[in-house]
């Protein structure tokens, strides 16, 4: 059995993301990909460039990822792997997930090493 894997980059500007997504869907269908690896938290602009946590920015990122989850079905029957910002009670995580058409979204890993350095202030968030 041959496993076809698609690895991609997606721009985080909403209009460009729409265009990139259409291209990705066409590619996955044409190549009959079995597995699609998306970038880290792909459905919102990267927010951890600022050291200061902003609840509104975080909420917008979570909402954007939640909205895009329904569109993962566009890539079926491929399995999709990526990460998303998610709330666990009062804590915030960058959670790796696996999605497929049969079982839906499943959390796979909560990122525990969070850098805190210029341009990547994940631990501060």
Label every PLM stretch briefly.
Residues 8-26:
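N-terminal phosphate-binding loop and adjacent alpha-helix
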Residues 18-22, 46, 121, 125:
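Tryptophan-centered motif/residue detector
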Residues 25-102:
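Cys-nucleophile CN-hydrolase/nitrilase-fold catalytic domain and related Cys-dependent amidase chemistry
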Residues 14-17, 37, 105, 118:
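Intrinsically disordered, low-complexity acidic/polar segments
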Residues 2-14, 95, 108-111:
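Active-site-proximal beta-strand elements of phosphoester/diester hydrolases
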Residues 87-125:
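Active-site catalytic loop in hydrolytic enzyme cores
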Residues 15, 46, 114-116:
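Conserved protein kinase catalytic core
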Residues 11-16, 58-62, 120-123:
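Short, flexible loop segments at the rims of nucleotide/cofactor-binding pockets, characterized by
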């Amino acid at each position: 059995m041959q496993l076809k894997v698609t690895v991609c980059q997606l721009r985080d500007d909403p209009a460009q993301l729409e265009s990139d997504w259409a291209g990705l869907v066409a590619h996955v269908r044409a190549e009959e990909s079995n597995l699609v690896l998306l970038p880290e938290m792909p459905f919102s602009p990267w927010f951890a460039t600022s050291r200061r946590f902003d609840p509104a920015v975080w909420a917008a990122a979570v909402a954007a990822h939640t909205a895009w989850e329904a569109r993962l079905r566009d890539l079926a029957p491929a399995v999709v792997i990526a990460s998303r910002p998610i709330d666990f009670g009062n804590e915030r995580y960058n959670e790796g997930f696996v999605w497929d058409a049969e079982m839906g979204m499943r959390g796979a890993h909560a990122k525990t090493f969070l850098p805190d350095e210029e341009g990547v202030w994940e631990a501060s968030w």
